Design a protein with these regions (language model features):
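Short, conserved catalytic-motif segment at the N-terminal edge
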Residues: 3-62, 82-84
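Hydrophobic (often cysteine-bearing) scaffold residues that line and stabilize catalytic clefts
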Residues: 8, 12, 62, 66, ...
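Active-site SXXK
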Residues: 10-17, 35, 58-86, 161-166, ...
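Short, well-ordered beta-strand elements
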Residues: 38-41, 338-339, 345-354
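Short, surface-exposed loop or secondary-structure junction motifs
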Residues: 47, 99-322
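Short, glycine/proline-biased beta-turn/loop segments that scaffold the active-site neighborhood
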Residues: 85-99
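Glycine-rich phosphate/pyrophosphate-binding beta-alpha loops
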Residues: 244-251, 325-339, 352-358
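Short, gly/Ser/Thr-rich active-site loops of penicillin-recognizing serine hydrolases
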Residues: 266, 270, 285-295, 358-383
Length: 383
């Protein structure tokens, strides 16, 4: 079965064909340069069984790529003076103080240093979609690592912690999905192609996930329990697609992700719409405290920033995103990724529906060929 490739440049088309030849099912890429969309590409199938190709309307589960957008919501509240990043979370969410969590700060949650990476022991896809159920259980957590002292990646719980902080500090107390829609998506013109909970009317646009669940990953802290594990078995379920999961549940396309991160690459403003100040955006590439220390979940150092984004650190970061320190990015399970090059005013998003794409046995990561093609096109634009 041959697959259709659409690309704005023959170099992108060639790279997409190489990616399909390596076994990826469907993929979409978009790049913005100096605030304008300059690269578009789609290839492969959104649903193999129905022979439905990936096109501009196809939306994909992007897993932890979601986290970078959720972090933006916190910074919007900080920009409005509704919170400070060094505030204890309990200042805004009093119930959170239970069981030794009273001193955990907003920044510690943003940087995965709050000590509570675990999910509720009895979580199911249906319960994960019940915001109040999740929030009540998180409020009663006891830290499993010393808050502010250990790195421990919050695989899933991250989004509810930050989302509830945003909800509590919002004068209107909007549900988190409504907040990001109104404060980010609508203002940047991407609200028709990015969802925190896919409405019934848009389910037919969602790409089917393929590949393995990688459920052999050791999870002794219940950060990623099997009933809600990021993978095809669970995340093709309607209940998962429609849950508001701000840590790993956004469903979107590369165009929307690239546009949001173009706003960051442009210093917080795009097409006359200012979301954040340039001064705040400049802080996003700052590494978290203890960035070279072992992350208890990854069991090795992880280049996470202080304010909700991965950052470039020599020898630690994904080489795909660039080679200087003024870059922020947000990767997800299966290989979806978006980054903003704050120096060169470039944003790039790659999304796909093949869960093995992020785990390559090839000496070269699957996306490297596409990254090179993108940079060749951008180099021509730079002259």
């Amino acid at each position: 079965m041959s697959s259709q490739i659409f690309a704005s440049d023959p170099r992108i088309a060639k790279a997409l064909q190489t990616i399909l030849d390596r076994g990826v099912t469907g993929v979409s890429v978009t790049a913005y340069y100096r605030g304008k969309s300059v690269i578009e590409g789609t290839a492969g199938y959104a649903n193999v069984e129905k022979s439905r190709p990936v096109d501009r309307d196809t939306i994909f589960p992007v897993f932890s790529t979601t986290k970078g957008i959720t972090a933006l919501a916190v910074h919007i509240q900080a920009e409005k003076g509704l919170l400070r990043l060094d505030d204890p979370i309990a200042k805004h969410w009093p119930e959170f103080a239970a069981n030794g969590k009273e001193a955990i700060t907003v920044e510690q949650a943003l940087s995965h240093r709050s000590g509570i990476p675990q999910m509720p022991a009895d979580v199911t896809p249906e319960l994960m979609g019940d915001w109040e159920w999740m929030i009540q259980r998180i409020a009663n957590y006891t830290p499993i690592f010393p808050p502010g002292k250990s790195n421990a990646y919050h695989v899933l719980v991250y989004g509810w912690i930050l989302g509830e902080i945003v909800r509590r500090t919002d004068p209107e107390h909007r549900p988190f999905g409504q907040f990001v829609k109104q404060e980010i998506f609508e203002r940047l013109g991407v609200d028709k192609s990015i969802f925190y909970g896919v409405p019934d009317s848009e389910l037919n646009r969602v790409a089917t996930l393929y590949g393995k669940n990688q459920e052999t990953i050791v999870d002794k802290y219940n950060v990623n329990p099997l009933p809600v594990f990021p993978g095809p078995r669970q995340h093709n379920l309607r209940s998962m697609l429609q849950a508001v999961d701000p840590g790993a549940g956004a469903v979107t396309n590369s165009a929307s992700l690239a546009r949001i991160f173009s706003m960051l690459a442009e210093g917080g403003e795009l097409d006359g719409v200012r979301i954040l100040s340039p001064e705040r955006v400049k802080t996003f590439s700052r590494p978290r405290e203890g960035v070279h220390d072992i992350d208890e979940i990854f069991t090795g150092p992880v280049p996470f920033g202080a304010y909700g984004f991965w950052v470039r650190q020599e020898g630690m970061s994904d080489p795909l995103v660039g080679d200087h320190d003024n870059i922020i990015y947000s990767p997800g399970a299966g290989g979806s990724i978006v980054w903003a090059d704050l120096r060169d005013r470039l944003s790039v998003a790659i999304v796909n529906n093949h869960m093995d794409a992020g785990v390559s046995v090839d000496p070269e990561p699957i996306w490297a060929v596409l990254g090179r093609a993108v940079r060749e096109v951008i180099a021509d634009l730079q002259g």
